[in-house]
């Protein structure tokens, strides 16, 4: 098999949604229909022994939410599917943003009762900015929901893209009878049953004009007929080019927990979602079928196996072929990386990997050698772009009750900081570490993980700072003068990038006015490369 052939078989996509829209359930069912698992864990059935395959962290199992991004690979219809299940909770949008830089398409899950919610909209804006193709699944049609025409209108207005229904619901809630497949001109009949976890055949009706069918489904079928006639006349034809440019989104209706509508989504992902495309590096554009390997670290996860205190760097392969044992270099440091124990994933479960290709997500055991946004190559000097770090919006101080555990605290914070789910700042003056995050839940997760994974009872308390900006200058001398003059407000992040801390936005404005030679940044990229100044 050639590299080009293998690349064309790849489909790499993320599932995004607002919390509780059914994203993790849909992930489970996609794995079920692809044959990757045989029983789907129910996200709500927390009292049972089953947990969702993609919710593996202890706190996720307790609370029933996804707070870490999971990666799963499976084969279906001669395609290799890399599926990334992202955190649904809004506090973890930074991790989700980085995951979205590693995919070629997105599957958006919408709760049919709530429509497009705030978190969904933020993530979709990221997809739109990157022109990522989006397939939409409107979930929970077996419950009382909004009118489908209203949902379609809202999706179109808020996303600013054409909505192309591929299926249309016949009824909803207790009167949900199924969906009409507009492409294949047939109706798929819904059968309820939340306990069904095995794949089942869906009953299909091809002749909707049969009087017996009209009598069976009554007014719901007639209403669906009228709505289908309306949308068929109003919606444009599906256009693959427009879809790939992020200008059209195919829409499916269904009920993930009942396995209904999942098969059609999976088939469409294989048929319409793009294979891996080119990737931008500072030096040039990288094509996926190039012979030489290149990849970028978009996520680091500590303690996937708490017994081994391991750290895995998740790498999106951007070009070429990975072969077990090959020599790879970290462009930032020039250091070699061992590749004899590289793995592929089914969530927490891992398998040693022999080969992989552009589009695949591989896991490299990491003991501090790799950082977020690191580029790996066979020797070429490349740096991929577009993996951001955001200035925290909430700060907390951290202390421990037992000073003898301070070494474990520093180790735990260093490793959790490497993941990017929390940012750890070391003050220029003093020794008390600062934790920075974009949401409150992140601190809860960190204290929980410090206790259960590192044996550290940590206390966190609000810090006096509320804002942070990374600072740069034209010359090292100018930057050092600024640091010396503001020493009590300076801290350093995980890559020693200097940061100016403030309690109020006015303090940043005053500093900008007094120091015209200093630039203040809301975001930074790899190893301190800055972009987007404060605004």
From Swiss-Prot:
Predominant localisation class: cytoplasm
CDD domains: RF3, RF3_II
One Gene Ontology term, aspect cellular component: cytosol
Localization in the cell: Cytoplasm
SUPFAM superfamilies found in the cross-reference section: EF-G C-terminal domain-like, P-loop containing nucleoside triphosphate hydrolases, Translation proteins
Alphabetic keyword roster: Cytoplasm, GTP-binding, Nucleotide-binding, Protein biosynthesis
Matching Pfam families: EF-G_D2 (PF22042), GTP_EFTU (PF00009), RF3_C (PF16658)
Gene3D superfamilies to which the protein is assigned, alphabetical: P-loop containing nucleotide triphosphate hydrolases, Peptide chain release factor 3, domain III
GO biological process: regulation of translational termination
Domain of life: Bacteria
Gene Ontology molecular function terms on file: GTP binding; GTPase activity; translation release factor activity, codon nonspecific; translation release factor activity, codon specific
Residues binding GTP, per UniProt: 17-24, 85-89, 139-142
Matching InterPro entries: EF-G-like_DII, EFG_III/V, G_TR_CS, P-loop_NTPase, PrfC, RF3_C, RF3_dom_3_sf, RF3_GTP-bd
tr-type G domain: residues covered: 8-277
Function of the protein: Increases the formation of ribosomal termination complexes and stimulates activities of RF-1 and RF-2. It binds guanine nucleotides and has strong preference for UGA stop codons. It may interact directly with the ribosome. The stimulation of RF-1 and RF-2 is significantly reduced by GTP and GDP, but not by GMP.
HAMAP family: Rel_fac_3
Family per record: Belongs to the TRAFAC class translation factor GTPase superfamily. Classic translation factor GTPase family. PrfC subfamily.
Name of protein: Peptide chain release factor 3
Organism, scientific name: Nitrosomonas europaea (strain ATCC 19718 / CIP 103999 / KCTC 2705 / NBRC 14298)
Designated gene of the protein: prfC
């Amino acid at each position: 098999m050639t590299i080009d052939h293998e690349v064309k078989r790849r489909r790499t996509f993320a599932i995004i949604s607002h919390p509780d829209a059914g994203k993790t359930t849909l992930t489970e069912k996609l794995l079920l229909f692809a044959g990757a698992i045989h029983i789907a864990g129910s996200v709500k059935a927390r009292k049972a022994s089953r947990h969702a395959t993609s919710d593996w962290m202890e706190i996720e199992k307790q609370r029933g939410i996804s707070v870490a991004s999971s990666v799963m690979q499976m084969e279906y219809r001669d395609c290799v599917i890399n599926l990334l299940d992202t955190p649904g909770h809004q506090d973890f949008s930074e991790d989700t943003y980085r995951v979205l830089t590693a995919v070629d398409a997105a599957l958006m899950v919408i709760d049919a009762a709530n429509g497009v919610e705030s978190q969904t909209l933020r993530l979709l804006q990221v997809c739109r900015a990157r022109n990522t193709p989006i397939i939409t699944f409107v979930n929970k049609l077996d419950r009382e929901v909004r009118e489908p025409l209203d949902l379609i209108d809202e999706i179109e207005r808020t996303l600013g893209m054409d909505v192309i229904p591929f299926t249309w619901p016949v009824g909803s809630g207790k009167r949900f009878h199924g969906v009409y497949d507009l492409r294949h001109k047939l109706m798929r009949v819904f059968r309820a049953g939340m306990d069904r976890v095995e794949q089942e055949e869906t009953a299909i009706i091809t002749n909707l004009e049969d009087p017996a069918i009209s009598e069976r489904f009554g007014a719901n079928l007639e209403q669906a007929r009228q709505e289908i006639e309306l949308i068929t006349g109003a919606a444009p034809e599906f256009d693959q080019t427009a879809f790939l440019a992020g200008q059209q989104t195919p829409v499916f209706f269904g009920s993930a927990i009942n396995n209904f509508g999942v098969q059609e989504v999976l088939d469409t992902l294989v048929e319409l979602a793009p294979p891996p495309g080119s990737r931008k590096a500072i030096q040039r554009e990288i094509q996926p079928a190039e012979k030489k390997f290149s990849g970028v670290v978009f996520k680091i996860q500590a303690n996937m196996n708490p017994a081994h205190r391991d750290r895995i760097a998740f790498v999106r392969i951007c070009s070429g072929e990975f072969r077990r044992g090959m020599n790879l270099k970290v462009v930032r440091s020039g250091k070699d990386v061992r590749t004899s124990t590289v793995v592929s994933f089914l969530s927490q479960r891992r398998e040693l990997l022999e080969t992989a290709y552009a589009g695949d997500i591989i896991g490299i055991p990491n003991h501090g050698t790799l950082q977020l946004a690191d580029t790996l190559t066979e020797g070429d000097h490349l740096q991929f772009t577009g993996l951001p770090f955001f200035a925290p919006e909430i700060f907390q101080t951290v202390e421990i009750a037992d000073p003898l555990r301070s070494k474990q605290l520093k180790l735990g914070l260093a490793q959790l900081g490497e993941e990017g789910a929390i940012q750890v700042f070391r003050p220029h003056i003093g020794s008390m570490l600062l934790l920075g995050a974009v949401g409150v839940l992140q601190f809860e997760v960190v204290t929980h993980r410090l206790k259960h994974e590192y044996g550290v009872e940590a206390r966190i308390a609000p810090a006096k700072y509320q804002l942070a900006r990374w600072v740069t200058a034209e010359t090292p001398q100018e930057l050092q003068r600024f640091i010396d003059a503001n020493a009590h407000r300076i801290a350093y992040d995980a890559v020693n990038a200097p940061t100016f801390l403030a309690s109020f936005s006015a303090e940043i404005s005053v500093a900008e006015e007094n120091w015209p030679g200093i630039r203040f940044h809301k975001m930074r990229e790899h190893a301190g490369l800055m972009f987007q100044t404060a605004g």
